[in-house]
């Protein structure tokens, strides 16, 4: 068995990563691939909490720009994260990983309500916990949710699983050939360099809790496991104040 560096993690999966090449919606093939990747980490006896984004279906900020009330648009985004979480739960259970879904907005017919102590108990019993519905409040991103849940469950690290992006760059490498990749940054660097990794609320919370983040490409097979065992891939973002 590989020696793990992080014994309890929050895995933040962007909505776009669940869509794959389709660009929107949920790609069952991608779900199956992710489930196997997560199982490889689960088999190392790592405690896993998962937060899914919803950008493959809906973005509250986009809805607000089109004239919707921002709070209403954000609630729609929360529902999108729950749909993604249910799809991932199904994929994980198909490969034999016991999984519980908890939502910040109660919908008991399909998931448990989010209760921190219950989530901790699930993790102690060796279950993966998927946190759906964001924080349950409008104006807060799923990146903030990941930072919050990481603090609440005592995670050692937040893994920012990106769709085709292998770290943090000085500019968009797809459009700027001079863009350089950072191997390590601090949360203050993100703000001072105006790097669009996560919103400032999420950065501030991560800085306060001093939980590190690792940004990496989830599309590369084996990358989640490589990060957990301590291989140097992606970009490490320290929570140093």
UniProtKB/Swiss-Prot annotation:
Which Gene3D superfamilies does the entry mention?
Acetylglutamate kinase-like
Q: Which cysteines are joined by disulfide bonds?
A: none
Biological process annotations from GO: 'de novo' CTP biosynthetic process; UDP biosynthetic process
The record lists ATP as bound by 12-15, 55, 59, 163, 169, 172
What is this enzyme's catalytic activity, as reactions? UMP + ATP = UDP + ADP
Pathway where this protein functions = Pyrimidine metabolism; CTP biosynthesis via de novo pathway; UDP from UMP (UMPK route): step 1/1
Output the superkingdom of the source species: Bacteria
Q: What is its EC number?
A: 2.7.4.22
Query: What subcellular compartments does it reside in?
Result: Cytoplasm
Carries keyword Cytoplasm? yes
Q: According to its UniProt record, where is this protein mainly located?
A: cytoplasm
CDD domains with a match to the protein in the record: AAK_UMPK-PyrH-Ec
Residues that coordinate or bind UMP? 54, 74, 135-142
GO cellular component: a single term? cytoplasm
* Record family assignment: Belongs to the UMP kinase family.
Q: What does this protein do?
A: Catalyzes the reversible phosphorylation of UMP to UDP.
Q: How does it assemble?
A: Homohexamer.
Record's protein name: Uridylate kinase
């Amino acid at each position: 068995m590989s020696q793990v560096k992080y014994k309890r993690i929050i895995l933040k999966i962007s909505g776009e990563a669940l869509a794959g090449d389709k660009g929107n919606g949920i790609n069952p093939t991608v779900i199956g691939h992710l489930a196997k990747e997560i199982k490889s980490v689960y088999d190392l006896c790592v405690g896993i909490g998962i937060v899914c984004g919803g950008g493959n279906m809906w973005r509250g900020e986009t809805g607000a720009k089109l004239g919707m009330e921002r709070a209403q648009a954000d609630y729609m985004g929360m529902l999108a994260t729950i749909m993604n979480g249910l799809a991932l739960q199904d994929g994980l259970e198909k490969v034999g990983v016991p999984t519980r879904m908890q939502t910040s907005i109660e919908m008991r017919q399909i998931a448990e309500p989010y209760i921190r102590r219950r989530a901790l108990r699930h993790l102690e019993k060796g279950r993966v916990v998927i946190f759906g519905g964001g924080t349950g409040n409008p104006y807060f991103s799923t990146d903030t949710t990941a930072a919050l849940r990481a603090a609440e469950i005592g995670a050692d690290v937040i893994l920012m699983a990106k769709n085709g992006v292998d770290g943090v760059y000085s500019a968009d490498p797809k459009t700027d050939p001079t863009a350089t990749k950072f191997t390590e940054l601090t949360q203050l660097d993100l703000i001072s360099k105006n790097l669009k990794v996560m919103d400032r609320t999420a950065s501030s919370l991560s800085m306060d809790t001093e939980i590190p983040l690792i940004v990496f490409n989830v599309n590369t097979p084996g990358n989640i496991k490589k990060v957990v065992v301590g291989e140097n891939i992606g970009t490490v973002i320290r929570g140093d104040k």
